[in-house]
Amino acid sequence: MTKVAAEIVRSAIDPQWFRAVLGQYPTGVCAVTAMDPDGKMSGMAVGSFTSVSLNPPLVAFLPDRSSTSWPKIERAGKFCVNVLSDQQLGVCKRFASKDEDKFSGLVYRLSDNGSPIIEGVVAWIDCDLHSVQEAGDHYIVIGSVRELQVESEDSALLFYRGGYGGFAAI
């Protein structure tokens, strides 16, 4: 496809339609947390977390380039992906907000790598920042996994068709 043809295709896709179609695919919801070199904690909610590689163990998430939380996490050079349970919608909303103190009143502990692990999560994956790639209006952030743990058998929080819920096996 030529560059001109690719541009025509790209501009012909309505962003709302694109979002509506991709909303048919359920995603897990995570809180990515970090502590910067000055000891200030930051975090953000993401619905774009995925595994990348088993060997070496790599994971990824895709923050919006306009995010105010991502630069703080990037500055830390390490982060923890907290897989939220279906009982943690409030935590999700807190980490999706512009609130500067997302950890106020929240129970957490620090990983061996120094990133916050939120109490009540289904699992957590602690990472060093491996690489960052620009991709349209987002970044692709790759983390090198240092440690990971399942914390509970609760259902993970899912986002599907614009709403939140849990998982029930059929």
UniProtKB/Swiss-Prot annotation:
It comes from the Bacteria. The lineage of its organism: Bacteria, Pseudomonadati, Pseudomonadota, Gammaproteobacteria, Pseudomonadales. Optimum pH is 7.5 in Tris/HCl buffer. Pfam families: Flavin_Reduct. Gene3D superfamilies: Electron Transport, Fmn-binding Protein, Chain A. It catalyses: FMNH2 + NAD(+) = FMN + NADH + 2 H(+); FADH2 + NAD(+) = FAD + NADH + 2 H(+). This is Flavin reductase. The keyword RNA-binding does not apply. InterPro entries: Flavin_Rdtase-like_dom, NADH-dep_flavin_reductase, Split_barrel_FMN-bd. GO terms for molecular function: FMN binding; FMN reductase (NADH) activity; riboflavin reductase (NADPH) activity. Catalyzes the reduction of FMN, and to a lesser extent, FAD, using NADH as an electron donor. Is able to provide the FMNH(2) required for the Baeyer-Villiger oxidations catalyzed by 2,5-diketocamphane monooxygenases and 3,6-diketocamphane monooxygenase. NADPH acts as a very poor cosubstrate. NAD(+) binds at S51, H138, F159, Y160, R161, G162. Homodimer. Likely forms a loose transient complex with monooxygenases for which it provides FMNH(2). It is an enzyme of class 1 (oxidoreductase). Keywords: FAD, Flavoprotein, FMN, NAD, Oxidoreductase. Belongs to the non-flavoprotein flavin reductase family. Optimum temperature is 30-35 degrees Celsius. Has a half-life of about 80 minutes at 25 degrees Celsius. Its EC number is 1.5.1.37, 1.5.1.42. Induction: By (+)-camphor.
